[in-house]
Amino acid sequence: MVINSIINKKKIPLYGNGKNIREWIYVDDFINAIEFLIKKAIPNQTFLIGSGYAEKNIDLINKIIKIIKKETEFKIEKNLIKYVKDRAGHDRVYKINSNKIRKLGWKHKIQLNDGLLKTIKHYI
């Protein structure tokens, strides 16, 4: 949504003050984790898949903007962010404990900034 908003020169909606924290994982890492678990064939178990990269939403948006400015010739408008009222009871942090899958030997491969760059290049 952030990249599409930038491409289409639309405001990026950011809930609350932007300091909510979310964990991020590159899609290829997520797929690799699913394939890893299928091959392990462990029945009746639940596994949480995560990268361990947790960022404030505002920081992630700023990273995306910085990468687009550095890696592309795309012109970025000023004042891109539109702060939106947060919903009542919105969780401040979404971060998981993926130790269970890590103990089996799985680990993400794509670093956050590398994943952001790959995603941006896909869209632009």
Model-assigned labels for residue ranges:
Residues 3-124:
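C-terminal substrate-binding subdomain of Rossmann-fold SDR/epimerase-dehydratase oxidoreductases
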